[in-house]
Amino acid sequence: MKVDELHKNLTDSGYLCTRQFAAQVSASINNKPVAGAFLYGSAGTGKSYLPMVISKITGHKMFFFQCAPGTKEDDLLMKMWPDEKSSSGVKISPGAVYEAAEASQKQKVILVLDEWDKTRPTADAFLLDFFQYGRISIPGKQTTANFKNLVVFFTANDERDFGEAFQRRFPKIDMMPLSPRLIKDALSMT
């Protein structure tokens, strides 16, 4: 999507931003080999909302994972549920990253890893392998992502540093509070 078209669509969807910001977002969703960006900023700057609006604009199916302190790789791949019927007492179902990779085989998808800076640093290395080869597996299942159909957004509040190799995979977009002009525009829309 071209910059002016994206800027208009974001604004029409109620996500007020500058053309310069829309240019950064446009570049990120056209990034290769994997599209997406690191969205950095303080609370309330629209980091989590931006991918939702982009999903609405583009029609891409969205997968969302809310990270918590200490989130580890297995949390991204699978969900574990108590199950009295299984011999282990646990039922395993695909998690957000696996589901997004699998869905990318058939359609365009957006994967949001919200508050990524709360994960353990080992999660960065896990995703580096995924973004290199696209393969992912859980007990009894394996899939490979179609990077042409996958857009990944990470949100962060700078709670921890990311490895240099991990940071090189995606552009960084600094999310700033709205300017007084955009606040005035937002108020006039209500």
Name each model feature, range by range.
Residues 1-190:
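AAA+ P-loop NTPase catalytic core and its hallmark functional loops
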